[in-house]
Amino acid sequence: MKQEKHGVLLVNLGTPDAPTSSAVKRYLKEFLSDDRVVDTAPLIWWPILNGAILPIRSPRVAKLYQSVWMDEGSPLLVYSRRQQRALAARMPNTPVELGMSYGSPSLAEAIDKLLAQGVTNLVVLPLYPQYSCSTSAAVWDGVARILKGYRRLPSVSFIRDYAEHPAYIAALRQSVEHSFAEHGQPDRLVLSFHGIPKRYARLGDDYPQRCEDTLRALTATLPLAPERVMMTYQSRFGREPWLTPYTDETLKGLPAQGVKHIQLICPGFSADCLETLEEIKEQNREIFLKAGGEKFEYISALNDEPAHIDMMQQLVAQRF
C-alpha cells in the first residue's frame, strides 16, 4: 500500500508583477473578471471593465503601488513568501507551496509542484481569516478548476476560515498588546476589515458575521473596555452600497466625538499589502489627523510573526 504524503497549499489574493500601469492592468483584468468578485452580467460588465475601469484605474493604482513597493517586490508577495518559508521550516517533511488566486505564482504552478512531489493529501489554506464568497470561495473554484485537468486526484482538505480560532485570536492579541505597550492605550482600537457589497451578504455570504465573530473573540481578550473597540469596513469599490460603517468616514468623524488617539488593525489581512500600507497607514491616517485627531498608529498585519506561523501550523496539523 502506497504511503500517504501530505502537502500544504497557502493561498492569497495576488499582486501585480511590477508597479507599472501595464502590470497593474493585467492583474486587475484577471481579478475583476472573476464573477466571484464582480457578479455583474458579462455583457454589461466587460465594456465597463475594459472601456473605463482598466484604462483609468491602472495608472492611478500603479502610482500607489510604487509608494509601497519593497526591494524584494510587492509587499503582499514578499510577506507571503516569508510565511511559506517559515511554515516549511516548521514542517520539513511536508511540502508547502504558495499560490495566488490572481497573478503569480499561480494556483496551477503551486498545485503542479505539490503533485509532482507525490502529494496524495492536499491541505488548502486560504489566508483569509473570515470567509467570503469573493475570496475563500474563489480559491475553492480555482483549485477545483485546476484539479479537473488531472486524472489522478489527491484527497483535498479545504480550510474554510479561522475567524475565531484560538491561535489566530492569540496572535492578534499579542500584536495589539505590543502596540499598547509601545504607544499606550488608545481612545479607540479600530478593527478595519475589507468590505463587500451589502447585496452579497443579503444573498447569503456570512462574511459580516465572521468579522463580528473575530471582533467579539479578540475584544474578550484585551485589557480595553469593549466600548473602546470598534469595527469598520474599508476599500469599497463601485457605486452600490457596501458594508458599513466605512473606515474613512468613521475616522473623519471620531475627533468631533473627542477621540484623539486611535490604533488601527486590519485583522482580515494576513499580510501587509496596498490596502493596509497605503490606504490605511497613509490615506486614512491623514483623514484622521486632518479631522482633528492627534495620534494614529497602524498595527501591522501578522505577516510572518512566529505566532502567526504557529497558527498556520496548528490549522494544517488538524487536517493531517
From Swiss-Prot:
Pathway assignment: Porphyrin-containing compound metabolism; protoheme biosynthesis; protoheme from protoporphyrin-IX: step 1/1
Catalysed conversion reaction: heme b + 2 H(+) = protoporphyrin IX + Fe(2+)
GO cellular component: cytoplasm
Ranges in a coiled coil: none
Residues the record lists as binding Fe cation: 194, 275
Subcellular location: Cytoplasm
HAMAP family assigned to the protein according to its UniProt record, in alphabetical order: Ferrochelatase (MF_00323)
Name of the featured protein: Ferrochelatase
Gene coding for it: hemH
